[in-house]
């Protein structure tokens, strides 16, 4: 019996087919060059797509904070949650009331003899959020010297200090004691939460910030900001610095201008 493979080979030779031995070196180099060009074209687009996805997650985090804020004021006679201000001394003092982010004296390991790290779990918003990850921007790097030196290592977002006082004289003690303005004293378009400058650990010694204490550089040429009505906006640095420098009251310097009457 004849071998069918031999018959097939004979037929292919008869019809003019020839088997190739493989790619030549020049052909391989051409293919590699094409792949390199395509990679150079695609990588920037992929990088932008990844950053956009992470920014979307950050925006969602701020939206969740906005929901928590509005649920809190609805349940507390229009009163805004304490902003967790006052720095390290208040952060470790359990005699002060809980704020939106944490309960003083119960946030850090070993504080007041507790020997545990509760982070934001004792904060007033955690009952709604139920997740540490919602307090952190996915682009916030935790392998930097600034992160190591930060007292508060469980948030990328800070509350606007305007909830306790005006532009030139912030009454941090009022905030420490839980005295804040009512939510109705602000416009829905006023800015409540933002991503502060993560390069300065001093800005993360509590849960609040003055508007002129810097903005993150994580999201290219701007940052995400949460407003009193719950909506979130991507604000470019240029606009942020214009608002900071504006001597008039605006959506960033949004202090009501009247004495606090709450609580």
Where are the model-predicted features located?
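N-terminal leader/signal peptides at the extreme start of proteins
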Residues: 1-25
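Alpha/beta-hydrolase active-site loop signature
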Residues: 22, 53, 239
């Amino acid at each position: 019996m004849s071998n069918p493979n031999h018959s097939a080979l004979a037929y292919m030779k008869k019809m003019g087919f020839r088997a190739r031995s493989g790619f030549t070196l020049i052909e391989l180099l051409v293919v590699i060059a094409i792949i390199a060009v395509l990679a150079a074209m695609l990588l920037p687009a992929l990088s932008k797509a990844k950053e956009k996805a992470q920014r979307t997650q950050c925006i969602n985090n701020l939206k969740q904070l906005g929901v928590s804020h509005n649920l809190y004021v609805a349940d507390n006679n229009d009163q805004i949650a304490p902003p967790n201000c006052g720095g390290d001394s208040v952060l470790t003092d359990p005699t002060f009331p809980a704020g939106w982010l944490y309960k003083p004296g119960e946030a850090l390991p070993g504080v007041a003899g507790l020997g545990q790290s509760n982070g934001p779990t004792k904060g007033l918003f955690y009952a709604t959020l139920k997740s540490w990850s919602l307090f952190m921007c996915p682009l916030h790097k935790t392998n930097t010297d600034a992160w190591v030196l930060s007292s508060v290592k469980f948030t990328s977002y800070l509350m606007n200090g305007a909830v306790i006082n005006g532009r030139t004289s912030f009454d941090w003690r009022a905030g420490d004691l839980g005295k804040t303005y009512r939510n109705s004293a602000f416009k829905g378009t006023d800015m409540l939460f933002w991503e502060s400058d993560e390069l300065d650990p001093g800005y993360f010694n509590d849960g609040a910030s003055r508007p002129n204490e810097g903005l993150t550089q994580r999201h290219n040429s701007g940052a995400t900001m949460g407003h009193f009505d719950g909506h979130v906006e991507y604000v470019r640095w240029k606009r942020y610095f214009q608002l900071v420098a504006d001597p008039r009251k605006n959506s960033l310097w949004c202090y009501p201008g009247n004495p606090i009457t709450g609580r």
